[in-house]
């Protein structure tokens, strides 16, 4: 492991659905370390990493009774990243977890597995160069941002589709930048609608995150 390693924490609860976490590691430039967090929620030594990415999950952040054994350590990790100013990227469930850990609200919504249109609403280097069409796989949405978080993008159905921390190097996206044609057949309910993968360049998010991490080295 080098001082520039980005840790990818996979928070998927279903082993046979852990196809997206490895894709995050694959699309993130530079050295990465992948770890399935749910089976072993031992807090990582954050000082050993240059940044952290929190993956999506079929779990819900508000289901603490079922998932508290690993959700509580994840929330602690999020708050530690903010306190220590360790670059953090939350993807889908990770977006929800960051906001929930900081006192925001996440609620159940319509299941979506398709491309959606995103509109930028605030400054966010993590979204630089990312087009408006992005893939989503989610059934929960953030309805109230966590303390210190500000909105950076919205959709027709959700005002807080992406966010960032006002002071710490923390960014979150509700969409799945790592979801590409390579894994399009994994979720059984995927329906691209009127768009195709040629219409999106959402993996750019990981290049932008690496750039932000490197700037802080």
Ranges and model annotations:
Residues 99-171, 175-180:
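Pocket-forming structural segment of enzyme catalytic cores
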Residues 159-217:
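C-terminal and late-domain segments of enzyme folds
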Residues 36-38, 59, 94, 140, ...:
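Catalytic metal-binding/acid-base residues of hydrolase active sites
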Residues 58-124:
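Cysteine-nucleophile active-site neighborhood
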Residues 1-73, 79-86, 191-217:
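N-terminal beta1-alpha1 cap of cysteine-dependent amidohydrolase-like domains
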Residues 20-22, 64-67, 102-103, 147-148, ...:
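Short amphipathic alpha-helical segments
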Residues 30-32, 84-88, 104-105, 148-152:
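Secondary-structure boundary/capping positions in well-ordered alpha/beta enzyme cores
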Residues 7-9, 35, 53, 89, ...:
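Hydrophobic/aromatic beta-strand patches that form the interior of the parallel beta-sheet core
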